[in-house]
């Protein structure tokens, strides 16, 4: 779920004003609990937010679901700030209906990392792949994603949207 961020922005001829964190949480509750009603008992969801709205997201998510993890997605697009740190990340909350029974296919999201030598189990390489491009190991993914680029201005999928996500996500 990628809800509107609590930003003061003009986009496509519409103006949006930032509101207090408390009012933003009230807004989230107007629709989020209905989304949760649609989840299967083993269901899970991912919900995006920036640094300014993520506290409200966590609060509202935890009213109905169990947060399993918070993923930090490093994004390079954004404007610098002369009196502050440029925001180069977003949070992605991973939450489930039932923490004892939910679907997560780790095999489909393993990450290919370059390594010098394989890990071995009973003398045989584990999750090891030697190719003409190098030697790799399939490893479990972390909750820090730095390998998915935001669409830059020269990319066909780029839009003017202030919080655009890449198709790869």
How would you label these PLM feature ranges?
Residues 1-169:
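Core catalytic lobe of class I
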